[in-house]
């Protein structure tokens, strides 16, 4: 059976992309077929090229027509460190087939401007005892779509944004491939949610 075609949207280095590339062996129900970035210098594009995956840098990430053209025939869209808001028209084209990974336990520490180090700084400043990672469906707002899966990460005494980020990222690298594989099986059976 043909694997589910996965398009990755990324703005940074692409470590979650690499986790997916490593997890999706030829027997997997999904394959990364393209990587699209809001930044032409994103490390994710280099990772894609090294893996033989099509890599596209958007000229205008807010342009729905450009993004839809770049997504092409994707069956599943995965936001992995993508910091731009996906245009409404694009979200509407992928109902139940567009997901995001976020480095906190949503709904806490999500929304506009809450990405990367800022999330971990906010978690530590709040005194929270636990952080974690969330995979959720994408809707028209940052980090507000229905939650698919979460995995907690305890905050340790003496944690810094960097130490917490490293432990959360390790969890993201396990959680995202697992969810993508589960969704790919569901898509192959005709249901996404």
Question: Predicted regions span which residues?
Answer:
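One-carbon transfer enzymes
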Residues: 1-193
């Amino acid at each position: 059976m043909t694997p589910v075609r996965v398009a990755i949207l990324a703005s940074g280095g692409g470590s979650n992309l690499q986790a997916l590339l490593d997890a999706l062996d030829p027997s997997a129900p999904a394959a990364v077929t393209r990587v699209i970035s809001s930044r032409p210098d994103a490390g994710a594009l280099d990772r894609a090229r090294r893996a033989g995956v099509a890599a596209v840098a958007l000229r205008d990430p807010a342009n729905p027509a450009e993004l839809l053209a770049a997504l092409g025939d994707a069956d599943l869209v995965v936001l992995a460190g993508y910091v731009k808001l996906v245009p409404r028209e694009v979200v509407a084209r992928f109902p139940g087939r567009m997901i995001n990974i976020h480095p906190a336990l949503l709904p806490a520490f999500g929304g506009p401007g809450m990405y990367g180090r800022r999330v971990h700084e906010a978690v530590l400043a709040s005194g929270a005892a636990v952080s974690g990672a969330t995979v959720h469906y994408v809707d028209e707002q940052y980090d507000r779509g229905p939650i698919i899966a979460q995995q907690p990460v305890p905050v340790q005494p003496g944690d810094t944004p960097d130490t917490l980020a490293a432990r959360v990222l390790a969890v993201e690298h396990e959680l995202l491939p697992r969810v993508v594989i589960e969704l790919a099986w569901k898509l192959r059976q005709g249901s996404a949610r």
